[in-house]
Amino acid sequence: MSKKRKWDDDYVRYWFTCTTEVDGTQRPQCVLCNSVFSNADLRPSKLSDHFNRQHGGVAGHDLNSLKHMPAPSDQSETLKAFGVASHEDTLLQASYQFAYLCAKEKNPHTVAEKLVKPCALEIAQIVLGPDAQKKLQQVPLSDDVIHSRIDEMSQDILQQVLEDIKASPLKVGIQLAETTDMDDCSQLMAFVRYIKEREIVEEFLFCEPLQLSMKGIDVFNLFRDFFLKHKIALDVCGSVCTDGASSMLGENSEFVAYVKKEIPHIVVTHCLLNPHALVIKTLPTKLRDALFTVVRVINFIKGRAPNHRLFQAFFEEIGIEYSVLLFHTEMRWLSRGQILTHIFEMYEEINQFLHHKSSNLVDGFENKEFKIHLAYLADLFKHLNELSASMQRTGMNTVSAREKLSAFVRKFPFWQKRIEKRNFTNFPFLEEIIVSDNEGIFIAAEITLHLQQLSNFFHGYFSIGDLNEASKWILDPFLFNIDFVDDSYLMKNDLAELRASGQILMEFETMKLEDFWCAQFTAFPNLAKTALEILMPFATTYLCELGFSSLLHFKTKSRSCFNLSDDIRVAISKKVPRFSDIIEQKLQLQQKSL
């Protein structure tokens, strides 16, 4: 990291004064045109160059007076005394607004001074004239400035979220997942769900690197230290949902053990999306071998540059639409469904290409039994994709997610009965290639066995139907049979009173379930609290998955040393920075530093 330069009073001879950022960084600001430069420009050669080139090296005011004059951003009246109009507030606002858009679009910080500002100056000169261009020139948009602005906006957004967490009438829900970036650095990302103004809000919390290792204790320490750093008690967390895909975040991991030890009341849930990857564990040997053959074929094509180029040229030559395959080692199961569909639809062309390359994969790939297994797998994972897609949204709670899983599993017996009768309607790819009764017999037996194993797996892993009968009033307090509630249940009176209100019935019919119960906090606090404790926990790590997609935009080869947290927060947070407060605080801080 480069050493920060410091202001010297002798620099006033070039008609510059000093501005100080929130972090203490000093930057030179021209009194004559209000331009703010980076800390790296805080040296005589740079300041003299600007003074001579932009202002002709002549200024008609007393330097001794200038030494005691604050920066233009601090006292506009002082500048007016020197005949210089101050636009610092609007310049700062423009600078912050651009930095905000830069982060939202996930652009490099240098895009402002290298591309946007030069283009804007040219446009201003052509369309509006030199006066407009001169005003636009004063907007500070250097790399350092944009970086500083984003940091400040990130801290303001974080402060808003922390204030909301402290004010939430109910313990918050946490969503936690881990991924590895392009530098093989493990990144831990967290989102939070809390109640604010009669609705459940989901917000980005943090994205931090795991510096030493990826053990459960390291994850827990990072998680705990975030709350300690911001002076929030850890027991504000009522639930935590993990991706469940790795040992450190799995059901029996160290992380879960440490969390439960520190917060005994916490509800731990596991993502109902990612564990679908475990479906592969239920595949019989022949089906698993077929899947691994697909993996090897794609890696043969995509994993070797010459093969990949030849593959693209081959498909262009024969005029086939699909010419790009995803890199397919141990893929996420969601991609697996899409890939298997593409492989099945391109089967003949891929087979020709393997023959063309004299690959030893040909024998397994063109086997008739393999193609039948491929068709079944493509159909099966397409169904799984549709299930996953139905749960990939914000606001998904564990009750709704488990209902979708339960509905999916209930289809299995119908599929099994149809398959036993050689009816493959639910598996269109398979139906397309089954041409003889003998082929239908052997695959029907395999499928019915696998669907039974899959059904057992879903019931065991996802605990389908967790909501007991006595708690189903949460889903519909008006149609629910109140006799199911025990007479000693203190909230039975509240339920009876709530059901008698026509206005509340109208609210129930027009509002989302979570928002409805949030709205009842004032009139029926016990009912609302009980209902929301069940609806609050995250059901998936979908938000983290979206966050990881943003991480890929930020962490590129040209920005591999980039500190992610602040930019990601500004980019994906729903909150908008309080620009007026940030600018006012900045001006006050600069004034005090003089």
Curated annotation (Swiss-Prot):
A GO cellular component annotation in the UniProt record: nucleoplasm
Coiled-coil annotated residue ranges, if any: none
SUPFAM superfamilies for the chain: Ribonuclease H-like
InterPro entries, per database record: RNaseH-like_sf
Note: May be derived from an ancient transposon that has lost its ability to translocate. Exhibits a close evolutionary relationship with ZBED5, but does not contain any zinc finger.
Name this protein carries in UniProt: Protein FAM200C
Species of provenance: Homo sapiens (Human)
Gene responsible for this protein: FAM200C
